[in-house]
C-alpha cells in the first residue's frame, strides 16, 4: 500500500502532465507533489521511507514526458520558490523563477549579464542543471553558488567551482533538487540592456519556431560543429514521423504539429540521431530530457 508522508503542500494522484509541457504530450504522474516551502520539501524527503522514485519537474520547456507516464512522485516547485532578492550585491533567486522573469527584473534594475536569459525558456533551476546558454553566455558565467537539497532531506551548498559546469551539463549529484541560485551583480545601463534583450528576441523570432509546440534545441552541438547543419546535411529538415517533425525554420527543433505523441517525438529524435551518424559519423546527444515509461 502506498503511504505518502504528511505535508503542508498538495498531492495529486494520476495527474496529467501534458498541459504543463511545451510539447503538450505525455502521460500522467503517479503522484504529483507541490511542496509548500523548502522545509515542507525536506519533511517529505526525510519521511519517504518507502523510497518512492522521485522526479523533478520545472517549466516543462525542454522535456518529453513519455506516454506511459512517470512512476513514483513527481515534484514541482511552485510560486513560493520563485522569489528574487537583492542582498549584499548578490541576487538570490528561487529555482522555479522563470529565466525570462529574471532577465526582466535585471533590466528594470540596471543589472547586466543576464540579457541572454530572455532567450532561454524554462526556470533557473533547470538552467543550472543544463548550464543553459545562448548568444555567447551560459549560466556558469553568472552563478556564484547554489542552495539545494538531496533526496535524503539534507540541505547543501555548492560553489560555482564545485558545480563543475560543462557544456550543457555539470558534475552535481543526480539526487539533488536545486532550491536557490546566487548570482553576482554587475551594474549596467537599463536602456542598453533592453536593446540587447530586444536584439535577442528578434533573432529568436527570425530563426526559431517559437510560436510552435516545441521544446527548444533538440540536440547539443558537438564540439566545433552545429547540430542543425548536420541534420540539414542529412536531408532531415522538415522530416516527419507521425505528428512530429523537424522544423523547416530551424531543423534542430522538433515540433508537435498538433497530433503527435511522445513516442512520435522520441522516435523522430532517435531516427535523426541514427541518420546523422550514418551521414557524418557524428553521434548527436539529446539536449531534451525524456522522462517516464516508453510505450
From Swiss-Prot:
<keyword id="KW-0133">Cell shape</keyword>
<dbReference type="GO" id="GO:0009252">
    <property type="term" value="P:peptidoglycan biosynthetic process"/>
</dbReference>
<dbReference type="GO" id="GO:0071949">
    <property type="term" value="F:FAD binding"/>
</dbReference>
<dbReference type="InterPro" id="IPR003170">
    <property type="entry name" value="MurB"/>
</dbReference>
<feature type="active site" description="Proton donor">
    <location>
        <position position="217"/>
    </location>
</feature>
<dbReference type="GO" id="GO:0071555">
    <property type="term" value="P:cell wall organization"/>
</dbReference>
<dbReference type="GO" id="GO:0008762">
    <property type="term" value="F:UDP-N-acetylmuramate dehydrogenase activity"/>
</dbReference>
<keyword id="KW-0131">Cell cycle</keyword>
<comment type="pathway">
    <text>Cell wall biogenesis; peptidoglycan biosynthesis.</text>
</comment>
<dbReference type="InterPro" id="IPR016166">
    <property type="entry name" value="FAD-bd_PCMH"/>
</dbReference>
<dbReference type="GO" id="GO:0008360">
    <property type="term" value="P:regulation of cell shape"/>
</dbReference>
<keyword id="KW-0274">FAD</keyword>
<keyword id="KW-0560">Oxidoreductase</keyword>
<feature type="domain" description="FAD-binding PCMH-type">
    <location>
        <begin position="24"/>
        <end position="188"/>
    </location>
</feature>
<dbReference type="GO" id="GO:0005829">
    <property type="term" value="C:cytosol"/>
</dbReference>
<keyword id="KW-0961">Cell wall biogenesis/degradation</keyword>
<dbReference type="InterPro" id="IPR011601">
    <property type="entry name" value="MurB_C"/>
</dbReference>
<keyword id="KW-0521">NADP</keyword>
<dbReference type="InterPro" id="IPR016169">
    <property type="entry name" value="FAD-bd_PCMH_sub2"/>
</dbReference>
<feature type="active site">
    <location>
        <position position="287"/>
    </location>
</feature>
<dbReference type="Pfam" id="PF02873">
    <property type="entry name" value="MurB_C"/>
</dbReference>
<dbReference type="GO" id="GO:0051301">
    <property type="term" value="P:cell division"/>
</dbReference>
<dbReference type="InterPro" id="IPR036318">
    <property type="entry name" value="FAD-bd_PCMH-like_sf"/>
</dbReference>
<keyword id="KW-0573">Peptidoglycan synthesis</keyword>
<comment type="function">
    <text>Cell wall formation.</text>
</comment>
<comment type="similarity">
    <text>Belongs to the MurB family.</text>
</comment>
<dbReference type="InterPro" id="IPR016167">
    <property type="entry name" value="FAD-bd_PCMH_sub1"/>
</dbReference>
<protein>
    <recommendedName>
        <fullName>UDP-N-acetylenolpyruvoylglucosamine reductase</fullName>
        <ecNumber>1.3.1.98</ecNumber>
    </recommendedName>
</protein>
<dbReference type="InterPro" id="IPR006094">
    <property type="entry name" value="Oxid_FAD_bind_N"/>
</dbReference>
<feature type="active site">
    <location>
        <position position="168"/>
    </location>
</feature>
<dbReference type="Pfam" id="PF01565">
    <property type="entry name" value="FAD_binding_4"/>
</dbReference>
<keyword id="KW-0285">Flavoprotein</keyword>
<dbReference type="InterPro" id="IPR036635">
    <property type="entry name" value="MurB_C_sf"/>
</dbReference>
<keyword id="KW-0963">Cytoplasm</keyword>
<keyword id="KW-0132">Cell division</keyword>
